[in-house]
């Protein structure tokens, strides 16, 4: 289900927000900019939060979790409006996204990180419901 969600988010962003130049899984990417292989910006990193599971009667499990979308753009004085507009385009693209093993993607929270000198990081947190069939 996480792989399906990741691929669905990636495909939807590539289709609806072509300005995004790099999409990957989150691994504290912005904390080690000088140490990592450079990636093109604007970039999106997808982070999974904890999923809590409840059994369904005899046919799988239903889960609830969070997915955080990290939008990373270059920082330039007065350019925050473009980053916020790009964040809005991402919301319009992935709000309500669904698949065979997930649905109900809904924006819950938005944060802006001011902890970096050369980049701006906007983080949107979405609620998502998962379905896991029994093996």
Question: For the regions a protein language model found, what residue spans apply to each?
Answer:
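Charged, amphipathic alpha-helical segments and their flanking helix caps
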Residues: 1-37, 45-135
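A solvent-exposed, acidic/Ser-Thr-rich amphipathic alpha-helical stretch
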Residues: 42
């Amino acid at each position: 289900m996480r792989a399906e969600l990741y691929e669905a988010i990636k495909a939807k962003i590539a289709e609806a927000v072509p300005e995004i130049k790099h999409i990957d899984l989150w691994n504290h990417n912005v904390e080690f900019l000088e140490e990592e292989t450079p990636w093109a910006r604007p970039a999106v990193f997808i982070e999974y939060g904890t999923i809590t599971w409840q059994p369904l009667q005899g046919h799988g499990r239903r889960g609830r979790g969070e997915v955080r979308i990290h939008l990373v753009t270059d920082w330039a004085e007065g350019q925050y409006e473009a980053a916020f507009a790009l964040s809005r385009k991402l919301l319009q693209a992935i709000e309500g996204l669904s698949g065979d093993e997930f649905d109900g993607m809904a924006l819950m929270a938005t944060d802006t990180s001011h902890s970096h000198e050369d980049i701006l990081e906007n983080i949107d947190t979405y609620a998502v419901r998962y379905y896991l069939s029994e093996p």
